[in-house]
Structure formats: structure tokens, C-alpha cells
Amino acid sequence: MTNIRKSHPLLKIINHSFIDLPTPSNISSWWNFGSLLGICLILQIITGLFLAMHYTSDTSTAFSSVAHICRDVNYGWLIRYMHANGASMFFICLFIHVGRGMYYGSYTFMETWNIGIILMFAVMATAFMGYVLPWGQMSFWGATVITNLLSAIPYIGPTLVEWIWGGFSVDKATLTRFFAFHFILPFIIAALAMVHLLFLHETGSNNPSGLNSDSDKIPFHPYYTMKDLLGMILLILALALLVLFFPDLLGDPDNYTPANPLNTPPHIKPEWYFLFAYAILRSIPNKLGGVLALVLSILILALLPFLHTSKQRSLMFRPITQTLYWVLVADLFTLTWIGGQPVEHPFVIIGQLASILYFSIILILMPISGHIENKILKLN
């Protein structure tokens, strides 16, 4: 008699995805972040659901409802800070996950990679709308500034902005619809993640060497279930450390002031995980140009499969491109720092140079270094 997990229609899917899945025997801890993202998503949906039970999406009561959650709801402060800092952990895992994909050439799985890019946009949209909900100063002005960028779209821009706002400014209608979208998007993200996995399991996982690993596969359970479990414990430990000791470390003090349309904060800036894109946006003096650069800063990932010139898939044995990769990582840290600084000298010029370097490395230098490495190894 066959095992129920191999014959039952539903258990069979779970079995092929998490138990008997043939997995390369040499994948490192950098491959843990996919499962960690899944844990982050589940955590965000659960904490978000409990927050939604007590939150009111009305401009007059939104701010005080968040204060009420923290003061009067049992462990409300814990749920609120787990949700807020859980978003930060989500993005840390997301950036590492994408970075690993870039380093080891996982973008050659085109369908998986493109679904991943769509997922990234969806997660960013969700996080942005979630930041608006507490209705503090930075929530209001962040929403105003970022939605206003759409007015740069020729012809339909201004109408589009008013349509998104549901009026002539960010107001009650905007907050209500942002809450509705913030609630529904994580479930869409969960569905997209399933599609992401579906496409991944069509090809099988990549591995650090970038070589075909069909001859050396091991079952996912117990090897990688245990390995993922360790990652999850460390993730929850890091989140607990952040939530219980430094809950406001990554937040903005301005968001503890209720939203006031008549008083602009001195420095309007988004959450830390958007600062690199915000720095790229600000480094271009033209509004439309800035918006295009902002979108391209993420959309450029879709070009990676076409910009791959090397005969090798992974960067493991490619020292020149490896160096460029780490320069790119350092550049992203620089952009993140610049995004949080005021618009004045020398930050403006540093931001512009860092933005030029970001696009140059991906579009020009990495493809050239791939060619050079082929020549050195006489692979042409």
C-alpha cells in the first residue's frame, strides 16, 4: 500500500513541494531565505489580522486607534511592533534572496525570476500602504509625496493622482482604500508565491556552483527542513530582539505626531527599505525622469537574463564580476544612507554618483566583465 502522502490529492502536492522534493546536495544557507520569506508573510498576515480587528480606517480616529491598540489591547503593543518590525525583517530577507539570485545566476530561470519581480513590486506596494495607515505626520506626507509622483505621467497624470486620492488631496477616502488594499494584497502575494514555487519546481533549484545537479540530489525532508528550521529560529530571535528591546529603532519619530496637512516635516522620507530607490528618484532633477529611474531601479532586474554574457552561470569562479557585485552591494548601502539625508551639498552629488554607478554596474560593467572572463578562460 502506498503512503497516504503519495496518494492523497492534496497531500501529494505538499509531498512534492516540501518532503520528497529532489534538492541539490550542496545548497548553502543563502538558500534559506525563500522559506524565511514564507514565514515572514505568514507572521505578517496573522499579526495584521489581529491589528485589523482593532484599527479604524478613518482620518479622525486612525491615529488614536493605533495608540489604543498599544495601550489597551492585550499584548497590542507586541502585535503592533511585531507587524512593523516584521516588515523590516521581510525586506532584509527579500533583499538577501534577490541578491543571492543575482550572485548565483538564478535569473536564468526566467519564469521564476519574473514572478519574483512582480512579487517584489507587490510587497513594496503593500509596505508603502501599510506605512500610511497609522496616520502620523510621515504617513500623511509620505503618501502625499509618493502618490504625487504619478502626476509626472504625461496627459493622464493629474487625473490619475486625483483618482487614487479619491479627492483633491490625501484624505479620508485615500486612507480607507489604502487599508482595503493593504488587507487584500498579502493574500495576492501568497498566491503569487505559490506560482513562484510552481515554476521553481518545474526546473529544480539552482546551486552555488551553477552546474547541473541532477546527478546529486537529496530529499528536501529531513535535510533542508532541519536547515530551514534553524534559519526560522534565528529569524524569530532577531525579530524578538528588535521588537522587545529596540521597537522604534527603524521607525521615524515624526510618525508619533498625528497627521497635519498644514505642517510639513523638515525631511520627508519613506521607511529605510525604500531609501535606495528614493535616493535614485531624488538624484534626477526632472520629475518624470526621477519617476522612471525609480521604477527602473527595480525593473532593471528583469533585464539580468539578457545582460548575462558569461559562459558560467554563477559568480563563484568569476573574480572580476564578483568584485563588481560587492561594489554594487556597497553602492546600495550608500544610496540607502543618502536617501535618509537632507537635499543639500554634498549629499546631492554623492546620490547622483551612486545612482550612475548603480545603473552602470548592472547595464555596462557586468556584461563587459563577463566577456573578459570568457576571454581569460578561452571559453569563446
Swiss-Prot record:
PANTHER family to which the protein is assigned, alphabetical: CYTOCHROME B (PTHR19271:SF16)
Subcellular location: Mitochondrion inner membrane
Family per similarity comment: Belongs to the cytochrome b family.
Broad class of where this protein is predominantly found: mitochondrion
Lineage: Eukaryota, Metazoa, Chordata, Craniata, Vertebrata
InterPro entries: Cyt_b/b6_C (IPR005798), Cyt_b/b6_C_sf (IPR036150), Cyt_b/b6_N (IPR005797), Cytb/b6-like_sf (IPR027387), Cytochrome_b (IPR030689), Cytochrome_b_C_euk/bac (IPR048260), Cytochrome_b_N_euk/bac (IPR048259), Di-haem_cyt_TM (IPR016174)
Binding site for heme b b562: H83, H182
More about this protein: Heme 1 (or BL or b562) is low-potential and absorbs at about 562 nm, and heme 2 (or BH or b566) is high-potential and absorbs at about 566 nm.
Membrane topology of this protein: Multi-pass membrane protein
Cofactor note: Binds 2 heme b groups non-covalently.
Domain of life the protein comes from: Eukaryota
Binding site for heme b b566: H97, H196
MF terms (GO), sorted A to Z: metal ion binding; ubiquinol-cytochrome-c reductase activity
Transmembrane segments: 33-53, 77-98, 113-133, 178-198, 226-246, 288-308, 320-340, 347-367
Protein name: Cytochrome b
